[in-house]
């Protein structure tokens, strides 16, 4: 029975090896590291947060595009981009714990002044003014 089990394992290992590519996998661009020791060790406006396997400063990526990164992808260690330029137009490369994702940037409320809701509200205020 053990020999049959070992033979089955060996056959599956050989079959899996047939699909493997040559070469080595690249190093993880964001390995688990202690990149900060507290909020005071981070740039202004950033916090020292757990990545699940270390700590890193979290906040906007300096020098990036307009808009803020939403905080919905925490805990996923997938690196889809390294900087905003790796993303499509209108998207930001946002940190998420130990990963980075391309997602549309959130605009601050002041920048939403062209929306229909704001225009309608301003029209009502102007009509009520003496």
From Swiss-Prot:
Q: Does the record's keyword annotation contain Magnesium?
A: no
Q: Name one GO molecular function term.
A: serine-type endopeptidase inhibitor activity
Broad class of the protein's primary localization? secreted
Q: Which residues form the WAP domain?
A: 17-61, 62-106
Q: Which residues are glycosylated?
A: 116
Q: Which GO cellular component term is one of those annotated? A: extracellular region
Which regions form coiled coils? none
Signal peptide per UniProt: 1-16
The alphabetized UniProt keywords are: Disulfide bond, Glycoprotein, Protease inhibitor, Repeat, Secreted, Serine protease inhibitor, Signal
Known SMART domains for this protein? Answer: WAP (SM00217)
**Residues passing through the membrane, by range:** none
Q: Does the keyword Translocase apply?
A: no
Q: Where does the UniProt annotation locate this protein? A: Secreted
Q: Which cysteine pairs are joined by S-S bonds? A: 25-49, 32-53, 36-48, 42-57, 69-94, 77-98, 81-93, 87-102
Record's PANTHER family?
Answer: WAP FOUR-DISULFIDE CORE DOMAIN PROTEIN 3, WHEY ACDIC PROTEIN WAP
**Name of the featured protein:** WAP four-disulfide core domain protein 3
Provide the species name: Mus musculus
Q: Which gene name does the record give?
A: Wfdc3
